[in-house]
């Protein structure tokens, strides 16, 4: 399994001003290809915090670390300095990064924009870093490789640094980060079924979840209590299976759903709604999501 960690930088994330939708978005994209962020660390705009946070994540030897935030021109944008400090590298002018910034100004009708120190700051990268194009924004993303050890094994962690502006982060992630992670993971298929249950408590199906996980240890099975509605308990139940074979993924997820359908019925509950995602055959051109119950025919 490919391992991914994330370091999110910004005081605004820690004081309640900004919700960390960036990490949520990246996590969802990765989960969709069968990979999961195993750790998210959020730190304030401080060289020491950024540096120590990155070192903490690197110590675990992940395949990728995605650093988000702090690449802009303002004084509190110090992520790249913090990353360089952690890696023992200098921060230096990067000609390719400067070219990307100038090209952005030309592309947006600001060809004569003077390159002030604040703007040149966005082109100062840790030595050995590669700038990544930022189509909608100014500050380039950054890619670098970090050698390490995990036990007796030599490892290489790819560190990506992305801007915190959501639409810029998404653009760079989609064009540069996601494809590289996908090459590392190989093609995986994700099958997901979500059941909306009525008439059973979360504690009622807890033993069933434990039993299902023993039978399907690689599956993700998670319950979410939704409170009482008209005096009856409501629970949402997620079931996710990831496999290299689409049919195997579909079949295992369907088997888990059948198991819970039987247990819920036996407990006096019922399925209000069932949604499948990623469970169409490859040749199907219709939507990948439907709401038919387990075992029913689907067009």
Where are these regions (language model features)?
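An accessory alpha-helical subdomain
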Residues: 158-261
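Flexible, glycine/charged-enriched surface loops at secondary-structure junctions
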Residues: 40, 113-115, 186-194, 216-226, ...
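Proline/glycine-rich low-complexity loops and linkers
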Residues: 42, 49, 77-184
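Glycine-rich beta-strand-to-loop/alpha-helix junction loops that act as flexible
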Residues: 9-11, 62, 67-75, 163-164, ...
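Structural signal for hydrophobic packing residues in well-ordered secondary-structure cores
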Residues: 34, 58-61, 87, 91, ...
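Glycine-rich phosphate/diphosphate-binding loop of Rossmann-like nucleotide-binding domains
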Residues: 1-45, 250-254
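Eukaryotic N-terminal low-complexity, Ser/Thr- and Lys/Arg-rich leader segments
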Residues: 1, 268-299
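N-terminal small/polar loop signature for handling phosphorylated ligands or for N-terminal nucleophile
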Residues: 24-96, 103-106
């Amino acid at each position: 399994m490919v391992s991914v960690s994330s370091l999110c930088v910004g005081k605004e994330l820690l004081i309640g001003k900004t919700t960390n939708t960036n990490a949520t978005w990246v996590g969802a994209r990765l989960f969709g290809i069968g990979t999961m962020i195993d750790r998210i660390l959020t730190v304030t705009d401080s060289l020491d915090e950024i540096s120590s946070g990155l070192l903490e994540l690197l110590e675990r030897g992940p395949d990728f670390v995605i650093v988000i935030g702090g690449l802009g021109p303002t004084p509190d944008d110090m992520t790249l300095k913090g990353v360089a400090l952690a890696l023992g590298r200098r921060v230096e002018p990067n000609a390719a990064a400067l070219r990307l910034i100038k090209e952005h100004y030309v592309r947006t009708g600001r060809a004569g924009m003077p390159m002030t120190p604040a703007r040149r700051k966005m082109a100062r990268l840790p030595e050995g870093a590669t700038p990544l194009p930022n189509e909608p924004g100014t500050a380039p993303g950054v890619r670098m490789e970090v050698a390490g050890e995990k036990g007796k094994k030599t490892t290489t962690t790819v560190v990506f640094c992305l801007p915190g502006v959501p639409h810029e982060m998404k653009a760079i992630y989609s064009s540069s980060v996601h494809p590289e992670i996908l090459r590392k993971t190989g093609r995986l298929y994700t099958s997901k079924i979500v059941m909306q249950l009525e008439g059973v408590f979360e504690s009622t199906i807890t033993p069933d979840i434990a039993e299902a996980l023993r039978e399907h240890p690689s599956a993700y099975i998670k319950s979410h209590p939704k409170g009482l509605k008209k005096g009856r308990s409501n629970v949402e139940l997620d079931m996710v299976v990831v496999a290299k074979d689409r049919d195997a993924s579909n079949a295992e997820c369907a088997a888990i759903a059948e198991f819970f359908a039987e247990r819920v019925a036996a407990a006096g509950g019922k399925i209000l709604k069932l949604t499948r995602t990623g469970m169409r055959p490859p040749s199907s051109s219709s939507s990948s999501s439907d709401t038919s119950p387990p075992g029913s025919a689907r067009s």
